[in-house]
Amino acid sequence: MKIALVGATGFIGQELGIALVRAGHEVTALVRNPDKAKLNLPFPCKICKFNPENEVELAGNLAGHEAIINLAGEGIQEKSWTKARIRTLFDSRIQPTAAIVRALVSLKDSEKSPTTFLTTSAVGFYGDRGDEALDESSDPGKGLLPDICKEWEIAAKTNLPAAVRLVMLRIGVVLGNGGGMLGKVLPIFRSGAAGNLGSGRQWLSWIHIDDVVQMILWAVTNSKAKGVYNATAPVPATNAAFTHELARLVKRPIFLAAPKIVLKIALGSRAILVLGSQKAYPHGAISEGFGFKFSNIQQALRDLCGDDIQRGISEIRVRQWLAKPLSEIFPFFQNEKNLEILTPDFLNFRVVGKSTRELEKGTLIDYKLKLHGLPLHWQSEIISWAPPEHFIDNQISGPYTLWHHTHKFEALAGGTLITDRVQYLVPLGLLGKLSAGPFVNKDVNSIFEYRKMKARELFGGN
């Protein structure tokens, strides 16, 4: 299918884009900043500017696609809910949705009109409902979040041509690596400073990132799917259950609960995000045959963060799609000398030598570099070697207490998807993490941003 994806640069959008391409679909990403998207989108696609104010341009960009997926919307957790921010939360959801509907109206008599429109809402539709079991037929709640969701859904339905199949997913709290709720709370848990929020009895309607992506794929490609579906796992979890399981997996203690009054003072009106309770069930999707990979919170968290190699780690994950085949990309990245090309000049990075003629499991590689002017020696060992799919190097000696780097390579649509995952620890334990951690994190991120830029210069991308 030819699919137009609005919101492709977001947390769900990036995962979904990869899954769509893996499934053989042709994707057009409609984005606010095309130049930024060209560097950061980890899947091959056509990139168009998304300008909901220009209806003629939008209709032209949507024409010829079979389906539209709309994930647009500013993050609801990121900033304080000032009057201006609340207006942005409404407008960033409702205006793009309404603009897409108007574009579909203008195309309704055209052979190039899309026939499927999947758009998102959220379980915030139901409001704070305590222990009440909620499904797609439940009434909306009261408050800011239900009001946003109600207007969002109305915008998708109003004046939509009858020939267009509409699917609306009320998405729960999405759990995945590198973003969403887990991206915010995992560093807190790893530092050993986590505890229940309020009583801990409030319900969390969550969903694993893999399952929400697969539900979107299922709904777009299944012509019988229509109307509203709760995109939530079959087994909701209390905040206490979530906290206990995540702390257990990262091997850190649970501190005293954060009292409700403290959270309300600290977060203001946003406290409802952590204190509100929605016990939502995905009855619609299950009754129509959708199967979940991760049904309970234990399964999901074990998959996402059950492999920390040491407690208290920091982590970075970076993905990039390059427009050359795996047969060309892997040989370049397995050549340790090419690290000098991919590393920013401020590190004065040089490869000194290695213990074997060719890389293999057990190979030791020696480097020298300067970190903020301080000369350093770094030795790493290849602890896993499985060409051309992956290799793992582990620091033996160097500037970090721990540096564990997994390199993965996947053939994708004639090019190569590269995934880097680094788990690392700065020296001096908690003191080092608190004092130097933010600066180290900034350095690590800048190193990988430079690597992405250089790799794209060498091999091309979107």
Describe every region a protein language model picked out.
Residues 91, 95, 128-168:
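Catalytic helix-loop patch of NAD(P)-dependent Rossmann-fold dehydrogenases
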Residues 220, 280, 298, 306-356, ...:
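Hydrophobic ligand-binding cavity/cleft-lining segments
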Residues 215, 222-269, 303:
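Mid/C-terminal beta-alpha module of Rossmann-like enzyme folds, strongest
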Residues 186-194, 202-237:
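Alpha-helical substrate-binding/gating segment
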Residues 157-161, 165-168, 172-203, 246:
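NAD(P)-dependent short-chain dehydrogenase/reductase
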Residues 86-88, 97-143:
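Conserved Rossmann-fold NAD(P)-dependent oxidoreductase catalytic core, especially the SDR/UDP-sugar
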Residues 3-23:
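N-terminal Rossmann NAD(P)H-binding glycine-rich loop of SDR-like oxidoreductase domains
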Residues 35, 39, 45-96:
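NAD(P)H-binding glycine-rich loop region in Rossmannoid oxidoreductase-like domains
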